[in-house]
């Protein structure tokens, strides 16, 4: 009996030893692979519907770029990426809603830096769009244009500035506090030596354009996608674009810098997860977005709306967005 027990125990020890050696061998071989690919190989994502929330109404620039990206992601992963338009609070309601979701990779916030970073810098948002989310990637970049109605009393930028100087606080400007329009207005006032009458006539571009066409404001700053038809019909006059260089396909429109006013503000369209999302999921989605920004069809689609593909990975987003918030905080102080 004792011999049988000893034999059995020896057999168990031998088996455990062989299993241990096998595990060490597997561990060693996996260590030769790339870190991200090893992690990603263990993650099956997505396996169900992914909700993509954006803080604006349907039909605007953010909505269009989000839907273009989401369609490409559906093609790649074979799962629905459902776009949800959630307005209110200049985007803060949508942001907080996504922030409160489980960090399981199935809830995404799609927004742009023209609003998020200004909100953070001015304290309009009581949270950080970088530190309180998990950044994934940037997908597109667009510029903002300032315009007047054809029927207005001015025909160019100089005439508007002349009247604004003669009548401080009388020229009406559509401003959404804590957005790119807020920053642009402040920079215009500083560089042009004017004071504008800043009016809140709506959050989204559609609402603000209705107010503009209803003569509630004299000046409005929006993406070209929102005004193309009106400009082509001659209803609106573009005074300039707030970019370092003239926009592709819009070379006839002067930058503000070319006209002597250093006002530059581009909008980067970003993808974020709730804080704490698995890095493997982040890497999978970031790699997919990088592929999308290199896709010819996607590039051509963006160009139709006078935007460009613009990829930044998580590390670059974190660094550059923090730097921009710090710069904006210093400016608004």
Model regions and ranges:
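Bacterial N-terminal signal peptides that target proteins for export
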Residues: 1-9
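C-terminal motif of bacterial Sec signal peptides marking the signal peptidase cleavage site
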Residues: 17-20
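N-terminal (or domain-start) structured segment
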Residues: 25-131, 177, 181, 192-219, ...
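An extracytoplasmic/periplasmic, membrane-proximal ligand-sensing/linker region
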Residues: 47-49, 190-192, 196, 279-333
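Conserved functional loop/turn residues at catalytic and ligand-binding sites
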Residues: 85, 102, 156, 215-216, ...
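Hinge/capping helix and adjacent helix->loop/strand transition within the periplasmic-binding protein
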Residues: 100-106, 121-207, 256, 268-301
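A ligand-binding cleft/hinge motif common to bilobed small-molecule-binding domains
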Residues: 114-124, 186-191, 214, 219-252
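C-terminal lobe and pocket-closing loops
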Residues: 226-294, 319, 323-326
